[in-house]
Curated annotation (Swiss-Prot):
Belongs to the icosahedral plant coat protein family. It is found in: Virion. One of its GO terms (molecular function) is structural molecule activity. The keyword Cytoplasm does not apply. Residues 34-46 have a biased composition (Basic residues). This is Capsid protein. Capsid protein self-assembles to form an icosahedral capsid about 34 nm in diameter. The capsid encapsulates the genomic RNA (Potential). It comes from Poinsettia latent virus (isolate Euphorbia pulcherrima/Germany/Siepen/2005). Keywords: Capsid protein, T=3 icosahedral capsid protein, Virion.
Length: 305
């Protein structure tokens, strides 16, 4: 009888040991899971370092413009236009000016917008596309001015104070090529883009103005251009090679979504007399406005009737 009592006590102690071991395992596992849940997650940073590629190339394919019209009185377009064919970078600081108007010469948009009386930008973005090597020295910066009475920035300090200011090495930004095929899409990471704030315009609609009339007006009374366009873009370059002033680094495209209303004859839009000079001021030679350098390549103005 005494031996049976000893065996029974041993079995009881063994079961208690097993129970204690199981409880210890459960406690340790619970603490580990709780520790994992409380471990802080890593946060994403907003900064981004761009590494110079060993080799890269820009491939741009044709994509037909998107055209939508709800009635005979309006049309909506989404496409791209080349507005600066050669962005030049040198040792000296240089600034190019791009007026954000649909009448920029040598663009498909200018040939369509002249048939409409008013316009508004739904989206308007300038995209810098480099085609220089990664060893190219210099930088490109962009900014917006919403008042034509303001002077053109003379250095990078003044440029950096503008709305939408962005700057990068002259070889960076090839990711923006995707935007040329999808003008209303999201901005790819790494793209060098200047975006117009279309939600904060001073007017709901802007009257169309021809390139020649805008040039003449910009020469004599630039502040009046606020009636015809919401803003102008500045593209600044500098920091190039010592002793070199004017190496081509890339191009600037405008990708846009624009709405045009109130159809009108193009002849009424040009504001030109039979001599081909602007009716605003025929004493001013066309294509000399400092604010409209991009249209200086226009020729044969006298042929426009």
């Amino acid at each position: 009888m005494a031996k049976k009592g000893v065996n029974k006590q041993a079995r009881t102690n063994s079961k208690l040991d097993q129970l204690v071991t199981s409880l210890e395992r459960l406690t340790v596992g619970s603490m580990q899971r709780k520790s994992n849940r409380q471990r802080p997650k890593s946060r994403k940073t907003s900064g981004r370092v761009v590494t110079a590629p060993v080799s890269s190339a820009a491939l741009i394919r044709y994509k037909a413009p998107s055209l939508n019209g709800n009635s005979m009185d309006s049309v909506r377009l989404a496409s791209k236009s080349l507005v600066i064919e050669a962005v030049k970078v040198g040792i000296e600081y240089q600034v190019s000016v791009v007026p954000l108007v649909p009448c920029i010469q040598h663009t498909w948009l200018s040939g369509v917008a002249c048939y409409w009386s008013k316009y508004r930008w739904r989206s308007c973005r300038l995209v810098y596309i480099p085609y220089c090597s990664s060893s190219f020295t210099g930088y490109v910066s962009m900014g917006l001015s919403y008042d034509y009475a303001d002077a053109i920035p003379s250095d990078e300090t003044e440029m950096s104070a503008l709305k939408g200011y962005t700057t990068t090495s002259a070889w960076a930004g090839s990711e923006g090529i995707k935007m040329l095929s999808y003008p209303t899409g999201a901005v790819p990471s790494g793209a060098v883009v200047l975006s117009l704030d279309c939600a904060s315009m001073s007017k709901p609609w802007y009257p169309y103005i021809s390139a020649v009339a805008a040039t003449n007006l910009g020469e004599k009374q630039p502040e009046l251009l606020n009636q015809y366009t919401p803003a102008r873009a500045f593209i600044g370059t500098g920091g190039g090679m010592q002793g070199v002033n004017g190496l081509t680094a890339g191009r600037v495209f405008m990708v846009y979504d624009i709405e045009l209303i109130e159809p009108v004859s193009p002849a009424m839009q040009e504001n030109l007399s039979s001599t081909g000079r602007s009716k605003i001021d025929q004493s001013i030679s066309p294509l000399t406005g400092a604010d409209f350098e991009i249209v200086r390549k226009v020729s044969a103005i006298s042929q426009i009737q």
